[in-house]
Amino acid sequence: MSNLSELLPTGGGQNAVDFVASGTLSSGQTVALKADGTVEAVSGVTEGIGSETSFAGGTITYVKGVYDANAGKVVLIYRNNSSSGAGTAVVGTVSGTSISFGSAVVFESITPYGVRGDGLSIAYDTNAQKVVIAYVRDRSDIGELYARSVVGTVSGTSISFGTNVAFSSTLNVAWVSCAYDSTAQKVVVSYQDLDPGQAYGYAVVGTVSGTSISYGTPVVFNSASTTETTASYDSSNNKIVIAYRDTGNSSYGTGIVGTVSGTSISFGTAAVFAAVTVEYLESCFDASANKTLIAYSNDSASGHGTAVVATVSGTAISFGSPVTFNAASTSWLGIAYVPTAKKTIITYRDVGNSGYGTLVKATISGTSVSFSSEFTFSAISTAYTEPVYTTDGKVAIGYLRDNSNGYGSVYTTPSTNSADFIGITDQAIANTATGAVNVYGGINEAQSGLTIGSDYYVQDDGTLSTTASSVKVGQAISATTINMMDLT
């Protein structure tokens, strides 16, 4: 049933095709064709945000997060300013539209400053089923910023850690980001190396074994001052993409492709994606478009929120035209791909709207990107936003609220399968049973309350309405009968 034309008989009769039902279907139900050839009810999920839950009292900063698919939990990490800057982690459990948190666990408590905020990053190793945190141990009191990482194991609502390991032997690093290469089964850490006063961009490959991690030799990817690194993994091309602020080149937004081989990484030629001063860089891979989306604040345009599509070809990278998603000062960006909606969401602090926590949904088409209208997820001053996709269209968002406590809430991504509409059931069909479905070119007589002569369309929730949508069904010829369009 992979060829749709084979399913749509010509002519105007009662065109009906037998399908196996996925779920119980009522008579007169609009149905969508699934990839396995069965049909399911056309339905949709409404966009929304659940109630806020605190995960940290006192002041926190720099929230980062990841989803542990094995444990089915969200892991958030942050700098606890109320505890001498201790690096802290907490496990979140999503249930419906709410999230609850276990007790906080410290992974770094070095005094007097704990962890450096711009050096905090986290990735999930799907092979080892472990969380990897890369961070900077802040001893700026003696002029040193140590490169450190640690492996975390989630159990229930808690997390435990192995012994921290250096990912660089130098004494001063910053701007850390990490990503997991699922093909090489390695973690890649990008960072700025401040020794010996060069501030170059480096990357290093890590291998998780049990509760520990070991690293290869760091490799330079930018021989100039480099800040704001953000690493992501392109699973279509099996490449690491690093976007960064090239301070050595007018602070332009720049990207480069890395190839992991064993415990090393090599790089192609860098390319500029924004010939402006960029800040708050975030990136992720959009698996539906097979592109990487880079979001940033355009400091050359009053900090407007902007994004650009990156295309990887071999070891080269190219970019589409940057597109503004928020024409106001935008800070503390976060980004996550939502596979159920085939969209990427960008969270941010909307300085132009009282600093509210806001998000947009990005849709990539070719080398361009378009955006939904803004959605406010926290109508209060918000910072350090971090979205984490979990399952079933749910995104857990961690953030600092009102310059105080850390909070989390669950965002439900709007979605519908109406684009996969195939027909209307002629009769009720039990789950896994076979039944008749009227397809285009046929007539369905299982409706009620139709207005004769009116055109009807499938809505996102599966109902039929005279409100125009992208899926037109046909015209009512009686209160109970609809003449479905003949596509042939």
Positions of PLM-derived features:
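Extracellular receptor-binding modules and their adjoining Ser/Thr/Gly/Asp/Asn-rich linkers
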Residues: M1-V74, Y78-N80, T88-S95, I110-K130, ...
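Beta-strand initiation motifs
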Residues: V45-S51, G96-S103, V154-T163, S209-T217, ...
